[in-house]
Every structure is written in structure tokens, then in C-alpha cells.
Amino acid sequence: MSLPARLRDEFAQYDDDSVVVTIDPATRCLLMYPISEWDIIQEKLDKLPSFQAQARRLQRLLVGHATDLDIDKSGRILLPAPLREFALLDKKVTLLGQGKKVEIWGQDQWDLQREDYIAEGMHGSEQFDSLTDISL
């Protein structure tokens, strides 16, 4: 998979020639992090209580699927088959920058998810007080 020049430039700020890709346990997409950002997340995951089932499940899903991938000189990464299969990736993918990470979606999956988000609107069942100060 080729990374757009803009993303390559952003990852270059971290002085990393590789990234970590793992699954998103909440949706059928992949999460791609610079190595240095993933190290922070993994440290937090490692501190979760090992006797809590939900914590162990999250560790198994995120850390268990975390894969270090080199970015080649052409700005490409080779996603392993299990990650591609999880996210239902085919030839067309969508990359969504999300701050310090990038979501990798199969184009068809993203189109469906985006339509669901739009149909649900901002009046979904979850209310976040922290969003009340955001103006678009």
C-alpha cells in the first residue's frame, strides 16, 4: 500500500522508517502509528490490570495484532494478509488522518460507515460534554 506524500512527511517528523499497524477493536479498520507513538500506547496497555477480562481482551486485540512494518523508499508498506482480511481491504483503501494515527479502511467499508455516521448525525445515543465547546 502506498502512503500519500503528506503522510510520509508527517511520519518523517518522527524519524521513523517504520510504523506499527494493528486492528481497531471497535470497527473493521486498521490503526497505523509511528513507532514512537505506539510505544506510548503499548506502555499504557501493559499497565492495565491483568486480572480484568476487558483489559486482557483489549491487550490481546491491540498488542496481539500489532505489526511493525517498514516504509520502503517509495513510501509503501506491505500489510500482512491477516490485517488485510480483518479490515476487509481490497484494491481500494481510504486513509483517514486522526492526529497521531491513521485509520486504514477498505473503501467500501468506509463508504458504509461514513453514511451511517451521517445518518446518525450528531444526535446519537452518546453525548460528550467535551464536544460542546467545539465549533466547526
Q: How does the language model describe each region?
A:
Residues M1-L3, M32, G75-L79, L83, ...:
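Short, structured motif recognition centered on aromatic/hydrophobic residues
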